[in-house]
Each structure stands twice: as structure tokens, then as C-alpha cells.
């Protein structure tokens, strides 16, 4: 069982040496899937890759991403959503759209802060923000507002924050011109950066891509992922995880963040995928034992060939194999 003193010094070889390992998707619960899918496809240009309905459990999953021409097919001839980068999974529990009292927790309101936002990176941020405003999209922060004038935050139908940044930056060799919109990163707040960085690097094999310290506001941002393609930058690639540390939280024994899966619910998880998810999970179990919490362990839940483990703050991470038929 993970505690505030748990450390993660042991490197998982299957994670650090597996070139097939990738940060696959981010899961958000939504109240009304028709409204939300329309929002992301019409305003941002995402495509609905797949919809999966689970009648017995009364929920549906919607998988979206920005247009890609390199998504392989699974054995059923469908897009293998678990082999792609930059996928957004929307989870709809049936009936919530008809409940006037049902409200999603967006992760940014006390006392239920934890998940922060998803981030889309664009070529021309001024043009993008102007177009979104003309289409009636609401904003939490416009470019002209706040301290940082080069980022904006749009609001999704359920109140989730969508950060908007540009990858067109002076002094960067790549990308060459516009490469379309990108699902750049997912942000979660963390209590103790030492523990979280150890976990994501040693247990899950991620690399620290960039650090951004903000002394006046007393917080630090850590950006992790499984590398940056040669023709991309850390701002134009997809599947980055941003960890936000507000200074001092690590010294408060009573402090904790909301993981999105206890009530009130909202954020669900990030998902990593690889060719042999079972072997990855087995090595983690063998080397860390009960220091890491699983719910469930690989192949032991209602849905087979998947696992969920928890990070130091209790956020869930799904582990699945490429080609999974859900």
C-alpha cells in the first residue's frame, strides 16, 4: 500500500526498454456524449475513431483524436485506438444526460481539485481563439487576460478546462510550418514531485522532457512522456503528461488531491499501452509488491487484458495491450 513515505527507486526494465510503450489516452467522464462529441469535432476538428457500448454495465466509451493517417487496424479491421497517440476517451454512464442534478467535477474547484486540464497545441493561437469565440465557445481565460498572454483556456460542455498553446515558436527548428491541431498534454496536480517523478520515470519508464519553474507564483511544472519525434517539439508532439506542484504541499501531512474517481467524479485516468502489457504489469508486481495499489490487477477484472494501478496521489493509470478488443 502506497503511503506518503513510499519511494520508487527500482527501474522497471520492461517500461524503460520497450519501444512500443506509449501514453495512449486520457479518460474524462461526460454528462451528454452527443453534445460533447459534437463540441470536440466541430470546434476543434477531432475525429470520432470508435464508440464502444457496454449494455450490461450501462456505459459507453467514445474515442476521439485529431486526424491521423498512421493508426493501425485491430484484428476486427477497426482503428486500433489503443495503438495511437493523443486519444481522448469520453466515458458516458447511461442516463446522466437526463438527470438535471448530475454535474461533472472538472477538477479545478475546491475542495475537489486534482486534475487540471487537457491541452491542445495549434499553429496560430490568435486565429484559433478568434474562431472559437465567434462560434460561441466559452473561455475561462482569454489570451489578453491574466499574467501569461500566450496561453488561453477554453471550457468544454462539462466545464473541463482546455488549455490552448502554440507550437509556432521562435528559435525552434521543428515543426516546419503548420502540422494541424495536436492533443499535446494532460495536466494533473501532485503533492510531492520527488515521489511522483520517481514513479513515472522508474515504474512507467517516462522521460522528463521539460521543467518550468514559476518562483513568483510558487509552483513548478514537470512535463513527461515517451520521447519527442524528430520532426516535432515538446510543444507540437502528443501524449505528454504535465505534473503541477504547488510548493509546500509535500510538507503538509493532511494534504491530498482529489483523484477524479471518488465522488464527485470527473477525470478518470490516463492509459499507457504496449505490445505486452501483461509482462509489464507482472514485472511491476514482482519488484514493488504491495507498495503499488492495483484495481484490478492485469486480467483479473470484469474486462480482460487490462489493469489499473495508482500513482502516489491516487490517480488511476490504465495499462492495456495494443490491439485490445474492448
UniProtKB/Swiss-Prot annotation:
Biological processes per GO annotation: glutathione metabolic process; methylglyoxal catabolic process to D-lactate via S-lactoyl-glutathione
Binding site for substrate: 29, 93, 113, 117, 147-148
GO CC, alphabetical: cytoplasm; nucleus
Regions annotated as coiled coil: none
Pathway as given in its UniProt record: Secondary metabolite metabolism; methylglyoxal degradation; (R)-lactate from methylglyoxal: step 1/2
Details of cofactor binding: Binds 1 zinc ion per subunit.
Binding, Zn(2+): 25, 89, 117, 163
Highest taxon, organism lineage: Eukaryota
Active site feature: 163, 318
Catalytic activity, as annotated: (R)-S-lactoylglutathione = methylglyoxal + glutathione
Domain VOC: 22-167, 182-322
Reported cofactor(s): Zn(2+)
Top-tier EC class: lyase
Key words, A-Z: Lyase, Metal-binding, Repeat, Zinc
EC number of the protein: 4.4.1.5
Single GO MF descriptor: metal ion binding
Keyword Repeat attributed: yes
Reported function: Catalyzes the conversion of hemimercaptal, formed from methylglyoxal and glutathione, to S-lactoylglutathione. Can use gamma-glutamylcysteine as a substrate.
Anything else known: Present with 2570 molecules/cell in log phase SD medium.
Family per similarity comment: Belongs to the glyoxalase I family.
Subunit structure: Monomer.
Protein name, per record: Glyoxalase I
Organism per entry: Saccharomyces cerevisiae (strain ATCC 204508 / S288c) (Baker's yeast)
